[in-house]
Amino acid sequence: MKSYLVGGAVRDALLGLPVKDRDWVVVGATPQQMLDAGYQQVGRDFPVFLHPQSREEYALARTERKSGAGYTGFTCYAAPDVTLEADLLRRDLTVNALAQDADGAIIDPYGGQNDLRKRLLRHVSPAFSEDPLRVLRVARFAARYAHLGFRIAEETQALMAAIVEAGELAHLTPERVWKETESALTTRNPQVFFQTLRDCQALKVLFPEIDALYGVPAPAKWHPEIDTGLHTLMTVTMAAMLSPDVDVRFATLCHDLGKGLTPKALWPRHHGHGPAGVKLVEQLCARLRVPNDIRDLAKLVAEYHDLIHTLPILQPKTLVKLFDSIDAWRKPQRVQQIALTSEADVRGRTGFEASDYPQGRLLLEAWEVAQSVSTKEVVAAGFKGAEIREELTRRRIAAVAQWKEQRCPQPQG
């Protein structure tokens, strides 16, 4: 009975990255031996145990055989005669098929260390194509390690495209697609995840609303990159630089979905694309079962991002109404989130990456001014019932108007 550290912990240690989770494989043991040693069994589908002290996961070495459709259609075989090499063979990428023994020696039967040096994401065996979830996993790894120069091997890209072409992605549950997407959105380069999916034709299957933006032009004066799909990924790149918040990054991804609905006869203009995009955001989020708070911000950003760009000329009444519409009084974080997504939109354009975005600062200033109006003072002044809200709104508009005269003076004449 021997235990080996496996997978991501070995990979990240070799890359000099922090190791977060440590997983182990046990060779030559039975479930009863693990229980007798004080381990707690937690795996339903195959034997996984928690260490009595560290609570880290220890799985019995196993092999997998395809027995049904999708990423759950596997029959597992775990027994003392399963070797470490056989266990590592079932893994997705060579860089994940690494193990380390108790003495620190690396076991690398499939060339994972060489691929780490080459910065290559390459599948271990042809069995890669039996699991459609691996299309998303590899796209996520590509995003996670893009800053280190990793790329996907051509032969692995070909297998990913074959999985998509065979219709295997239909077997993925919405929850699993969202989980992988959410994880990809936390990486340094989330745009790589979506570009990778597009390269293997998976984007139009899983995110047709985003795929529809490719080939849709915008006015070259405002969008030198012209293509709305390119612009979308440029804004996601910028959002990742501006904020670690998944809500902000996802909302940025969805901000221009409405442009995919513009009739070709009206191109390259997209009047009203913001409100039009709200329904597409709802559609995408319902299909992937995106959490409500993330969905709601994305809807607001789709509807109002163009309005924020015109902030210096907005009427005080319009600004206060905007704060009402985004429910800022109860969810004040939305003001900052919407400011960041709007900035990502403006800077996510060819040649505008280093642009200043004063509208974001002005939005936050206007919010501070509107928020400073005291509800207690309104109540103390004798207003009751519906009058309180009306007077609050009046005072907020007056305060924002006074601030705006100083910060955004209008030209005379």
From Swiss-Prot:
Q: Per its UniProt record, what InterPro entries does this chain match?
A: CCA_bact, HD/PDEase_dom, HD_domain, NT_sf, PolA_pol_head_dom, PolyA_RNA-bd, tRNA_CCA-adding_enzyme
Q: Which residues form the HD domain?
A: 228-329
Catalysed reactions listed for this entry: a tRNA precursor + 2 CTP + ATP = a tRNA with a 3' CCA end + 3 diphosphate; a tRNA with a 3' CCA end + 2 CTP + ATP = a tRNA with a 3' CCACCA end + 3 diphosphate
Binding-site residues for Mg(2+), renumbered to this chain: 21, 23
The cofactors required by this protein are:
Mg(2+); Ni(2+)
In its keyword annotation, does this UniProt entry include Nucleotide-binding? Answer: yes
Q: What does the Swiss-Prot or TrEMBL cofactor note state?
A: Magnesium is required for nucleotidyltransferase activity.
Pfam families referenced in this protein's UniProt entry, alphabetically: HD, PolyA_pol, PolyA_pol_RNAbd
Q: Which residues bind CTP?
A: 8, 11, 91, 137, 140
| Biological process (GO), any one | tRNA 3'-terminal CCA addition
Residues binding ATP, per UniProt: 8, 11, 91, 137, 140
- Keywords noted in UniProt: ATP-binding, Hydrolase, Magnesium, Metal-binding, Multifunctional enzyme, Nickel, Nucleotide-binding, Nucleotidyltransferase, RNA repair, RNA-binding, Transferase, tRNA processing
Q: Which GO terms describe its molecular function?
A: ATP binding; CCA tRNA nucleotidyltransferase activity; cyclic-nucleotide phosphodiesterase activity; magnesium ion binding; phosphatase activity; tRNA binding
Q: Any keyword NAD?
A: no
Could you tell me which cysteines form disulfide bridges?
A: none
PROSITE patterns linked to this entry: HD
- The EC number of this protein is 2.7.7.72, 3.1.3.-, 3.1.4.-
What UniProt notes about the protein's domains is:
Comprises two domains: an N-terminal domain containing the nucleotidyltransferase activity and a C-terminal HD domain associated with both phosphodiesterase and phosphatase activities.
**Record's function text:** Catalyzes the addition and repair of the essential 3'-terminal CCA sequence in tRNAs without using a nucleic acid template. Adds these three nucleotides in the order of C, C, and A to the tRNA nucleotide-73, using CTP and ATP as substrates and producing inorganic pyrophosphate. tRNA 3'-terminal CCA addition is required both for tRNA processing and repair. Also involved in tRNA surveillance by mediating tandem CCA addition to generate a CCACCA at the 3' terminus of unstable tRNAs. While stable tRNAs receive only 3'-terminal CCA, unstable tRNAs are marked with CCACCA and rapidly degraded.
* Subunit note: Monomer. Can also form homodimers and oligomers.
Sequence similarity: Belongs to the tRNA nucleotidyltransferase/poly(A) polymerase family. Bacterial CCA-adding enzyme type 1 subfamily.
Q: What else is known?
A: A single active site specifically recognizes both ATP and CTP and is responsible for their addition.
The protein in question is named Multifunctional CCA protein
